[in-house]
Regions:
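Short, glycine- and charge-enriched coil/turn segments that flank and shape catalytic ligand pockets
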Residues: 27-31, 105, 159-164
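Topogenic membrane-insertion module of multi-pass membrane proteins
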Residues: 1-68, 75-89, 100, 113-123, ...
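Transmembrane helix interruption/hinge and helix-loop junction motifs
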Residues: 29, 101, 109-110, 282-289
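Alpha-helical transmembrane segments of multipass membrane proteins
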Residues: 20-24, 93-98, 122-126, 149-153, ...
């Protein structure tokens, strides 16, 4: 139970969702399965590493302000947490490297997952360490989500000299997720205290911008015939309907900035990553995979009633 609290267990399904959705979008399915499974495990390992190291870096502050967290409460020794956090970080980069070299039919091996995994690990440590208390914290958090999505897609693309590493639409989707999360993180800067704050206004605008980027990004694809949903009308409508409740709650938090309203907005905003990711799975691999990713919301919602997601 203490470890589940430390890694913020409900949130892991958002990573399962966006890494899986990126692979499904790029590969139009789960083939090759070995690469799909391995790159998803890499994403989970890196995410859990970030969650654990977050509390390792914050242990002195948590002893004063959040003594109920597993490390200051004595449920998990700081040494154990350090070993687990750094070990998972190395495991995540290692799994990403392996994913690019597993057999994939005629597809060549690729070092792209290793490069993305290593860059993600660096940004995770930068956020957990020196950047968390600075204005760059939301940017770093958004960067983690950008790289998380690109990690999922990276196993599908070889590195070719003179060619872009990723298609433009994939990069724009990743940036859309990053901007969306950057907005949510900005709104969460003072969630425990509440009260009027420019962060709420700015965060709401940035979250809306991220949602718009997600809605229009597939239109940048040069091969839209492979999509299972029209990227010009149906898909933007889907994203709009998914993001709208988050934006409405955000607007309500701006008007009445109580801690409860802000925290509810953040919680809903984080959990909404799953249906957003499911939309891209459906776009690239069909409705069956879209539903499968969407169903990850079930354990997420159940577990979020028992564990904090922020």
């Amino acid at each position: 139970m203490a470890w589940a609290q430390l890694v913020r267990l409900p949130n892991v399904f958002t990573v399962l969702a966006d890494v899986s959705a990126a692979f499904l979008l790029a590969s139009h399915g789960t083939q090759p399965v070995s690469r799909f499974v391995t790159i998803v495990l890499a994403g989970v390992a890196l995410y859990w590493a970030g969650m654990i190291l977050n509390d390792v870096f914050d242990v002195e502050r948590d002893q004063q302000y959040r003594p109920g967290r597993p490390i200051p409460a004595g449920q998990i020794a700081i040494g154990q947490a350090r070993i687990a956090g750094w070990g998972l970080l190395l495991a995540g980069v290692g799994l990403a490297t392996v994913a690019g070299h597993l057999p994939a039919g005629d597809a060549p091996t690729t070092w792209l997952p290793a490069a993305v995994g290593l860059l993600l690990a660096i940004v995770i440590v930068a956020y957990d360490g020196p950047l968390k208390k600075t204005p760059l914290a939301p940017v770093a958090m958004g960067g983690c989500r950008v790289l998380s999505f690109l990690l999922g897609a990276s196993a599908c693309f070889p590195i070719i000299a003179g060619e872009p590493l990723f298609p433009k639409y994939v990069v724009t989707i990743a940036l859309g997720f990053g901007v969306y999360v950057m907005g949510i993180t900005t709104m969460a800067r003072h969630e425990d205290k509440g009260g009027p704050s420019p962060n709420l206004h700015l965060g709401l605008v940035v979250t809306a911008l991220g949602s718009i980027m997600l809605a229009v990004a597939p239109q940048m694809s040069t091969n839209q015939a492979g999509f299972h949903v029209s990227p010009r009308d149906v898909f933007p409508f889907m994203i709009g309907m998914i993001a709208l409740p988050v934006l409405i709650r955000g607007f309500g938090a701006v008007r009445d900035p109580s801690p409860l309203k802000i925290q509810t907005t953040i919680r809903v905003g984080i959990l909404t990553i799953i249906p957003l990711a499911a939309s891209f799975a459906a776009l690239g691999a069909g409705p069956t995979w879209g539903i499968a990713i969407f169903l990850l919301a079930v354990p997420t919602i159940y577990l979020s009633l028992r564990f904090r997601v922020t």
